[in-house]
């Protein structure tokens, strides 16, 4: 937990203290709560709201809901691994090995993407909250496991890449069948 530095002082890693202590519970509950809220929304109100969208916005909604689900499942996996280490079910080395399978870099379309303004407010709130949670978890992961644990240090929020956005929309549109 503490690393020796020059002069004999020890560096305290706040993220490590938070993750491997009782103060991890609120973060875990927040993450799992967001997973549950997103699932309820997407299976209920979100499904009804998506039917009211234009074709373009509906395609964007479908792509973003997949990104949202992927992002939340990756964050949930990370949280579950940390909880397992915290409760003694796994060693930190086991967690470090398993967490290499977890990706904390699921981006979202840029908010000026065509159709973004039509997306339901509740859905956009879930996307924003999931991006914030992912960014927090990613920073904690980087502090605990080192900068090498995260390959792409570019902020994840909403990357502007019009070509990628259009390819994603086309893939979603033609995958409907």
Per-region residue spans from a language model:
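Surface-exposed peri-terminal alpha-helical interaction modules
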Residues: 2-177
């Amino acid at each position: 937990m503490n690393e020796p530095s020059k002069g004999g002082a020890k560096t305290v890693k706040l993220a490590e203290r938070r993750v491997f202590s009782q103060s991890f519970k609120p973060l875990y509950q927040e993450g799992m709560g967001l997973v549950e809220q997103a699932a309820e929304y997407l299976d209920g109100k979100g499904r009804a709201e998506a039917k009211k969208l234009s074709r373009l916005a509906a395609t964007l909604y479908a792509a973003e809901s997949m990104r949202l689900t992927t992002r939340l499942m990756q964050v949930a996996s990370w949280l579950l691994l940390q909880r397992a280490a915290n409760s003694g079910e796994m060693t930190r080395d086991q967690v470090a090995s398993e967490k290499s399978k977890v990706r904390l870099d699921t981006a979202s379309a840029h908010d000026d993407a065509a159709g973004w303004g039509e997306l339901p407010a509740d859905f956009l709130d879930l996307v924003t909250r999931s991006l914030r949670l992912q960014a927090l978890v990613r920073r904690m992961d980087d502090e605990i496991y080192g900068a090498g644990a995260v390959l792409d240090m570019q902020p994840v929020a909403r990357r502007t890449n019009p070509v990628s956005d259009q390819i994603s929309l086309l893939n979603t549109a033609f995958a409907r069948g």
